[in-house]
């Protein structure tokens, strides 16, 4: 996990809006980026639906929301359509961003 007041690692990933998302384009804005393991699983679906329900509150604060997982863009599009998700999901197939943010790797208990 990235620590507070530390520059966020670069993000450049394909998005469900058919563009490439670049974190640097959001400089000066509030941004929530949440990571999740897999589309359409119980915990990940619950988390995504919670962000979706709260999206109007985040928008009032000029805050963007993005979800990132290792799922394909096709999987993200189906997931987004099924649950009527109103924000973009980003696909990190090679897990480079997930690893930069230290949210992917062997579990340590």
Q: Where are the model-predicted features located?
A:
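Chalcogenol-based redox active-site neighborhoods
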Residues: 1-109
